[in-house]
Curated annotation (Swiss-Prot):
Cofactor comment text: Appears to bind only one FMN molecule per homodimer.
Entry's family note: Belongs to the pyridoxamine 5'-phosphate oxidase family.
Naturally occurring in which organism (per UniProt): Mycobacterium tuberculosis (strain ATCC 25618 / H37Rv)
Name of the protein in question: Pyridoxine 5'-phosphate oxidase
EC number(s) from the headed UniProt entry: 1.4.3.5
Other notes: The electron density for the FMN cofactor is weak in the crystal structure (PDB 2A2J), which does not allow FMN to be definitively placed in the M.tuberculosis PNPOx active site, but the residues known to interact with FMN in the E.coli and human PNPOx enzymes are found to be conserved.
Residues bound to FMN: 76-81, 91-92, 98, 120, 155-156, 201, 211
Protein encoded by which gene: pdxH
Keyword Flavoprotein: yes
Length: 224
């Protein structure tokens, strides 16, 4: 560890004391209540996503995705690319670690952590693959570099060095140099979480946060 790293090291007491303060001034709204969901969970989730974008939250559509591997939870951040009445969807390689886990246990949860606004939204439910049409529609919207990256990377597999990874990208870049349209790689697509439970969380003073859960068409307020 260099001198600069030692100067900014956080000791155990500092870590224990770290906490943010929450209140109406953080998100500029009143207390989350049942009437916020009069138009359903999807309307509120879209509204909160739009609020995060307007507030300048970095990657407001990022969500922490949890899957199960051999009975053990595994999490990572992914980007929500479809949000509709059917649920939330993301795209990946079907042979990635999460793809293999979902093949065994097709159930997942995802949390949108909008810390800057003192809000979170949580979705959980069964998972299924998105349609071929949805795959092609989203693929056509991806930047060319991201398309090439999907071809170059054997997602979640070990790689010997950064140089090897760069060489793989260079190879597929040459391969598709004369093609205006890059095809969808085999084994690449998307998954959709169909919400069984949706929870909205809003931070408030003294840790007395607001939590409202939508499950089986019922609204419930949960203790923080």
């Amino acid at each position: 560890m260099d001198d600069d790293a030692q100067m900014v090291a956080i000791d155990k007491d500092q870590l224990a004391r770290m906490r943010g303060e929450y209140g109406p001034e953080k998100d500029g709204c009143g207390d989350l209540d049942f009437d916020w969901l009069d138009d359903g969970w999807l309307t509120l989730l879209r509204r909160w996503l739009n609020d995060a974008q307007r507030a300048g939250v970095s990657e407001p559509n990022a969500m922490v995705l949890a899957t199960v591997a051999d009975g053990k939870p595994v999490t990572r951040s992914v980007l929500c690319k479809i949000l509709d009445e059917s649920g939330v969807a993301f795209f990946t390689s079907y042979t990635s670690a999460k793809g293999e886990q979902l093949a065994v246990t097709p159930y997942a949860s995802a949390t949108f952590p909008w810390y800057q606004l003192g809000r979170q939204a949580h979705v959980q439910g069964p998972v299924s693959k998105v349609s071929t049409e949805e795959i092609f529609t989203y693929w056509s919207m991806r930047p060319r570099g991201a398309q090439l990256g999907a071809w170059a990377s054997q997602q979640s597999r070990p790689v010997g060095s950064r140089a090897q990874l760069d060489n793989q990208l260079a190879e597929v870049t040459r391969r598709f140099a004369d093609q205006d349209q890059i095809p969808v790689p085999p084994g690449w697509g998307g998954y959709r979480i169909a919400p069984e439970i949706v929870e909205f969380w809003q931070g408030r003073e003294n840790r007395m946060h607001n939590r409202i859960r939508v499950a089986n068409g019922r609204l419930e307020r949960l203790q923080p």
